[in-house]
């Protein structure tokens, strides 16, 4: 699961779509409470990959003539990330309800196919981008992308898929929207992980030594795979559009529907 999380969290192909298939193929000997928490907390490893790769762009302080200086451009970026995160905070109380009612094959497959088709529509109608650098992103852009990010509360949507579609519609370049999407993940995924742990503990659950080890290994593996996935995507979007990912999502959605049909029959 660490491998799947590390790769699919950053590519716009839905980590949930892959997780739901993986859980069908591999029967995990763990409680549903632990698996629900594990699926989210494992993202901490993925977040660390973003921090490591983009540390120079994310750290708002530097040195000049032996003095610590503040970087206004980095502070501005962080304020925009915070602005984009506010819509997610508002709808976050719905997260558990959405998971309980829509974490199923049909919903996941529908979202995979829908956003796969959206990638084709957006790329085919796309004009030349007018935002190619992070500092050109306005607060309006950030908030709208944040609203698109809210759609990821529906299983199978893909957080990165939703924000990338939103960013492309706003006129951001592929590389710019991909990088901004990585940064948006830091507060959202860190907050979601913390919330899941708190709910797990408050609910009276206690991790066994084996579960702690499994979670730690999952985070480490997710970190390593995320490093590779992020580097791949940033290099890929410099030369290609997102149609490949759209096609992949549609095919995966059909596979999920097929698995759902077989599961219902047998």
Give each language-model segment a name.
Residues 1-266:
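Multi-pass membrane proteins that catalyze or facilitate reactions on polyprenyl-/lipid-phosphate substrates
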């Amino acid at each position: 699961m660490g491998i799947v999380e590390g790769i699919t969290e950053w590519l716009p192909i839905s980590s949930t779509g892959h997780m739901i298939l993986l859980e069908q193929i591999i029967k995990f000997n763990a409680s549903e409470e632990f698996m629900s928490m594990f699926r989210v907390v494992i993202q901490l490893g993925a977040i660390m990959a973003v921090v490591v790769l983009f540390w120079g762009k994310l750290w708002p302080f530097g040195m000049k003539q032996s003095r610590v200086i503040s970087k206004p451009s980095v502070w501005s970026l962080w304020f925009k990330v915070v602005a984009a995160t506010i819509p997610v905070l508002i709808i976050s109380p719905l997260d558990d309800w959405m998971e309980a009612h829509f974490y199923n094959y049909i919903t996941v497959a529908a979202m995979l196919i829908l956003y796969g088709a959206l990638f084709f529509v957006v790329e085919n109608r796309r004009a030349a981008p007018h935002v190619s650098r992070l500092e050109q992103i306005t607060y309006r852009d950030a908030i709208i992308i944040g609203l698109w990010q809210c759609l990821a509360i529906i299983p199978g949507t893909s957080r990165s898929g939703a924000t990338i579609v939103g960013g492309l519609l706003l006129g951001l370049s592929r590389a710019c929207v991909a990088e901004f999407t990585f940064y948006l993940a830091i507060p959202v995924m860190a907050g979601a992980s913390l919330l899941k742990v708190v709910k797990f503990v408050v609910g009276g659950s206690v991790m066994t030594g084996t579960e702690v080890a499994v979670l730690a290994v999952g985070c480490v593996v997710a970190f390593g795979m995320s490093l590779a996935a992020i580097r791949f995507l940033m290099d890929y979007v410099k030369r290609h559009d997102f149609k490949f990912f759209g096609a992949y999502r549609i095919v995966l959605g059909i596979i999920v529907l097929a698995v759902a049909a077989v599961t219902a029959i047998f």
